[in-house]
């Protein structure tokens, strides 16, 4: 596998709709950076958030997940309580080629503040807005800025196409828009 450079990402985004909307240059002035970088793409977080709450003394069960475990927030800023967790999604919609696997890393600006981002790999032929898991590991409230960078995606191209893609498996998160909660 090879990591793909900026010119390949640009070509795939503008010519094949791999990333929409696509920001062709990295935006940095007064914001947490987003857009095309040398070997990746810094995605923006949208203005919709689901923040974990324990109002009903719920237990988190991935096989029987209750949406009541979250409080919905929409706006330009999200405050994640200390030692808590939120779900969000990217502004961008991704369409991953059959011979590409995409991995995600958090932004150093947030990581240096104790805010950790997790996203599972984007599999070949998956498409949708990416649901982002954001953990505030600090004992203080943490501010997340909608419309600004939240994570960086790295595109790894295989030497050949995979035998079975996410689309072939009819994956349960195919075509998702907005925040997707766990599904069985």
Curated annotation (Swiss-Prot):
Q: Name one GO molecular function term.
A: dCTP deaminase activity
- Give the transmembrane region(s): none
Q: What EC number(s) are associated with this protein in UniProt?
A: 3.5.4.13
Active site per UniProt:
133 (proton donor/acceptor)
Which top class of enzyme applies to this chain?
Answer: hydrolase
List, alphabetically, the InterPro entries matched: dCTP_deaminase, dUTPase-like_sf, dUTPase_trimeric
Q: Name one GO biological process term.
A: dUMP biosynthetic process
Q: Which reaction equation describes what this protein catalyses?
A: dCTP + H2O + H(+) = dUTP + NH4(+)
Positions binding dCTP in this chain are 107-112, 152, 166, 176
Top-level division of the source organism's lineage: Bacteria
**Which UniProt keywords are listed?**
Hydrolase, Nucleotide metabolism, Nucleotide-binding
Q: In which pathway does it act?
A: Pyrimidine metabolism; dUMP biosynthesis; dUMP from dCTP (dUTP route): step 1/2
**Function per UniProt:** Catalyzes the deamination of dCTP to dUTP.
The subunit structure is: Homotrimer.
**Similarity comment text for this entry:** Belongs to the dCTP deaminase family.
Please name the PANTHER family in this protein's record. Answer: DCTP DEAMINASE
The name this protein carries in UniProt is dCTP deaminase
Which species is this record about?
A: Granulibacter bethesdensis (strain ATCC BAA-1260 / CGDNIH1)
């Amino acid at each position: 596998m090879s990591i793909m450079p900026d010119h390949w990402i640009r070509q795939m985004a503008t010519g094949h709709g791999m990333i929409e909307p696509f920001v062709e240059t990295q935006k940095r002035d007064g914001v947490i950076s987003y857009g095309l970088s040398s070997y990746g793409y810094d995605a923006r977080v949208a203005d919709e958030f689901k923040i974990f709450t324990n109002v009903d003394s719920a237990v988190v069960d991935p096989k029987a997940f209750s949406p009541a475990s979250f409080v919905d927030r929409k706006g330009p800023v999200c405050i994640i309580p200390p030692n808590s967790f939120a779900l969000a999604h990217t502004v961008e919609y991704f369409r991953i080629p059959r011979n590409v696997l995409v991995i995600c890393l958090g932004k150093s600006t947030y990581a240096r503040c104790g805010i950790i981002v997790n996203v599972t790999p984007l599999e070949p032929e998956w498409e949708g807005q990416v649901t982002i898991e954001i953990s505030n590991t600090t004992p203080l409230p943490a501010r997340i800025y909608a419309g600004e960078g939240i994570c960086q995606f790295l595109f790894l191209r295989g030497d050949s196409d995979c035998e079975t893609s996410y689309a072939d498996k009819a994956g349960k998160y195919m075509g998702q828009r907005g925040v997707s909660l766990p599904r069985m």
